[in-house]
């Protein structure tokens, strides 16, 4: 039976019928798989004490345990080529048993590309699964079914093949059903690739004469139907694109893999049925816009947890940046020479691409943040180099790095579950970009958008890319005083009320960020969350959108005032304010409302109020972001790190003090994973690597970072650094360590 694509508005209407039943919060100590049938135990949630705004839960909820694919919560993935596919015959210089028998190749998931780049005349698809594949690929795929490894399929016309967006769709659903049954280890079908970026490229090139008249007509129809400056129109445009891709992939929600790059559309895909989410990270961008890999993890992991689906990480080592001579270079990419004939210069350039260091670091970063798989792009070109001694191909430095990383994951399979106690709640129509800024990259920039940027550019600081790139500074991952302890959830997806609340109730604290339309359902969901023990950070703008004094403990008088200079917290500490903030005047609606912040004139800037078992923190400065006159200028200054957000910084710092179990001091990036018998605390030093687009990386030994860790209430019986294997001396619940530039340290803390 042919299935129909369901549009966003239909899904949203179906989800609007909510109910107000209580949602139990389940937790346990340790880690497993959400699909593994764990017996969940209901536990009472702790209550925030005096001087706290949130109560920590160190025993993670069952929902945050890592999901498993074919019995494991992590797989390395390679596309089918040479060593990664045992069905491929190795010959000549590639007949290298030492490489072929490496664990990363003997024990990996395989991605199969069908290979065909044409379609039957007038059709948008091939009718049967088998018709998509060349016989040689199909033969390998048939044999791979016995390997006991997960397989991912990419049909051709592949997900980015434009002619597939028009033409008749005539599919044999019985054939597809039989194919799936015959290949039970196919765990994903890549339905779309670089979703948001691809859509922009299509629309901007809609009149390209290389497209057929039918294709140009379809692109212009979609372009004219939806406004590029209306975020909800852009949402509909994105769903048109996704629904077409689902249609030509049999509308299969069981194996629906959604792959995106620069726009973080993970929640949209999961709401529409995706069961695997993939984040692509790369080093492309312009002189101001930067791929911010750390922020990407907050979105995709949050979506996976909200919808209880799998997620993976895809690493593309392309780099847009300055050459050492000051010229700009696009799509610089590393490649090692494998040519035997040295009389001909190799076209491959091992000095190009992102640095060896950041490519290695991001693998550990993704693994530690919970990715169920990591896939390297173009590894066939940068993992191998010709070895004149053996006359065979051997591993390049990047190949050795990845092999060592894979071996680490095999030696330490119990990484625990990433500890992320704070949910940042953003609207579904945000279309948030890896470099922040305007919704979808084109919609007018609003103060509410500035609030979202304020949060993420405080957690992962902006930096002057224009200046630092010219000096060879790389970026992509960022040191920060804030822990990687935040997930992004989306309240207004077409998800059942009870399912969303199950997801949200797993987080001790949440921040309502951005412009959520006024909605009784949103108010109801937030009240439920707080009444059951959660802490909600609420901006005063929402006092005019249905959140009243009974919930917040304060009312807006209707008057406004300007805050600048400084503010003082309830501990008597003064904090600097740069810029001007428009604030709503607040008056207590209850004697139980406690003032947290006041400006220099004694006016209320933030309050704490207990509602049910939880707490509402109301922040007066509108959108917690400074006033601006030009949205474009505000975006650029934010990206370059020229704007600070002191109210976001204060709230995030206060939540971290209450919720993160460790205190880490020193210039680094860090996070924690909860395990059965303790913790992993991981630390990265992203400084000290100079990388031009046309030169090998240079490591500055002077950029080592001395860190100090206070274990707080965690009683450690032993601490060991896992990558180097050293025992760490702990004195008075504290220890020190030096992280070399561009390196990673993982501390196993046994309780």
Regions of interest found by a model, annotated:
Residues 417-452, 505-507, 527, 605-626, ...:
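Carbohydrate-binding surface patches
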Residues 516-604, 652:
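A glycine-rich, often tryptophan-bearing local segment used as a flexible ligand/cofactor-contacting loop or short
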Residues 311-322, 340-388:
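Substrate-binding cleft of secreted/luminal carbohydrate-active enzymes
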Residues 99, 106, 120-124, 128-131, ...:
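Helical hinge/lid and interdomain linker segments adjacent to catalytic or ligand-binding clefts
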Residues 259-346, 362:
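Glycoside hydrolase catalytic-domain groove-lining segments
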Residues 77-78, 154-157, 190-192, 227-263, ...:
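Aromatic-lined carbohydrate-recognition surfaces of secreted/lumenal glycan-active proteins
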Residues 19-141, 146, 150-152, 176-178, ...:
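Mature N-terminal, pre-catalytic/accessory segment of carbohydrate-active enzymes
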Residues 51, 55-62, 66-70, 86, ...:
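Aromatic-Pro/Gly-enriched surface loop or interdomain linker
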């Amino acid at each position: 039976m042919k299935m129909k694509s369901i549009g966003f508005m239909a899904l949203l209407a179906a989800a609007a019928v909510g109910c107000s039943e209580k949602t139990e919060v389940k937790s346990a100590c340790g880690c497993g798989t959400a699909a593994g049938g764990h017996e969940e135990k209901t536990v009472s949630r702790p209550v925030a004490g005096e001087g706290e705004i949130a109560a920590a839960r160190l025993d993670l909820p069952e929902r945050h345990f890592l999901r498993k694919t074919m019995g494991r919560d992590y797989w390395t993935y390679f596309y089918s080529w040479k060593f990664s596919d045992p069905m491929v015959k190795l010959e000549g210089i590639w007949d290298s048993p030492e490489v072929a028998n490496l664990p990363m190749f003997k024990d990996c998931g395989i991605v199969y590309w069908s290979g065909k780049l044409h379609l039957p005349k007038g059709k948008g698809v091939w009718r049967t699964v088998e018709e998509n594949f060349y016989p040689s690929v199909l033969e390998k795929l048939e044999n791979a079914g016995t390997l006991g490894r997960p397989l991912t399929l990419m049909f051709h016309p592949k997900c980015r093949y434009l002619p597939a967006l028009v033409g008749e769709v005539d599919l044999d659903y019985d054939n597809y059903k039989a194919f799936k049954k015959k290949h039970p280890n196919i765990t994903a079908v890549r339905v779309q690739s670089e979703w948001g970026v691809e859509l922009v490229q299509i629309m901007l090139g809609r009149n390209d004469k290389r497209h057929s008249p039918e294709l140009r007509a379809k692109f212009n129809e979609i372009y004219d139907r939806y406004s590029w400056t209306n975020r909800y129109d852009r949402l509909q445009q994105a769903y048109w694109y996704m629904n077409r891709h689902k249609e030509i992939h049999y509308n299969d929600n069981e194996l629906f893999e959604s792959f995106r790059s620069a726009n973080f559309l993970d929640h949209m895909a999961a709401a529409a049925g995706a069961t695997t989410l993939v984040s692509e990270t790369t080093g492309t961008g312009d002189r101001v816009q930067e791929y911010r890999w750390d922020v990407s993890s907050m979105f995709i992991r949050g979506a996976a947890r909200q919808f209880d689906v799998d997620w993976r990480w895809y690493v593309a080592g392309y780099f847009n940046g300055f050459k050492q001579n000051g010229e700009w270079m696009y799509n610089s990419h590393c490649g090692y020479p494998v040519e035997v004939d040295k009389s001909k210069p190799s076209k491959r350039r091992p000095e190009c691409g992102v640095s060896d260091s950041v490519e290695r670091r991001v693998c550990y970063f993704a693994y530690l943040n919970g990715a169920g798989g990591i896939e390297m792009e173009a590894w066939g070109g940068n993992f191998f180099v010709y070895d004149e001694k053996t006359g065979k191909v051997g591993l390049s430095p990047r190949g050795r790095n990845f092999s060592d990383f894979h071996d680490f994951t095999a030696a330490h399979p119990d990484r625990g579950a990433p500890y992320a106690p704070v949910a940042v709640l953003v609207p579904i129509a945000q279309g948030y970009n890896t470099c922040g800024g305007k919704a979808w990259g084109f919609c007018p920039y609003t103060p509410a958008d500035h609030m979202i940027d304020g949060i993420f550019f405080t957690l992962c600081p902006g930096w002057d890319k224009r200046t630092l790139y010219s000096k060879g500074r790389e970026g992509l991952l960022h040191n920060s005083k804030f822990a990687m302890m935040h997930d992004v959830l989306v309240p207004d997806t077409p998800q059942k009320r009870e399912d969303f609340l199950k997801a949200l109730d797993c987080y001790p604290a949440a921040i309502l960020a951005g412009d959520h339309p006024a909605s009784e359902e949103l108010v109801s969901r937030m009240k439920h969350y707080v009444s059951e023990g959660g802490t909600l950070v609420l901006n005063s703008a929402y006092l005019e959108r249905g959140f009243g004094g009974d919930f917040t403990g304060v009312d807006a008088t209707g008057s406004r005032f300007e805050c600048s200079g400084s503010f003082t917290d309830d501990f008597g500490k003064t904090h600097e304010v740069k810029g001007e903030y428009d604030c709503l005047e607040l008056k207590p609606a209850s004697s139980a409302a406690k003032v947290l912040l006041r400006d220099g004139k004694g006016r209320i800037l933030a309050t704490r109020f207990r509602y049910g078992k939880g707490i509402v923190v109301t922040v007066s400065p509108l959108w917690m972001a400074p006033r601006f006159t030009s949205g474009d200028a505000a975006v650029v200054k934010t990206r370059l790190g020229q704007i600070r957000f002191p109210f976001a910084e204060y709230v995030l710092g206060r939540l971290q003090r209450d919720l993160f179990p460790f205190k880490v001091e020193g210039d680094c990036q860090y996070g924690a994973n909860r395990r059965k018998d303790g913790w992993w605390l991981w630390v990265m030093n992203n400084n000290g690597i100079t990388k031009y687009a046309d030169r090998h990386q240079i490591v500055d030994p002077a950029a080592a970072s001395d860190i100090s860790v206070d274990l707080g209430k965690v009683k450690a019986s032993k601490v060991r650094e896992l990558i180097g294997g050293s025992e760490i001396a702990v004195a008075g619940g504290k220890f020190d360590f030096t992280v070399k530039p561009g390196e990673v340290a993982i501390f196993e803390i046994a309780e």
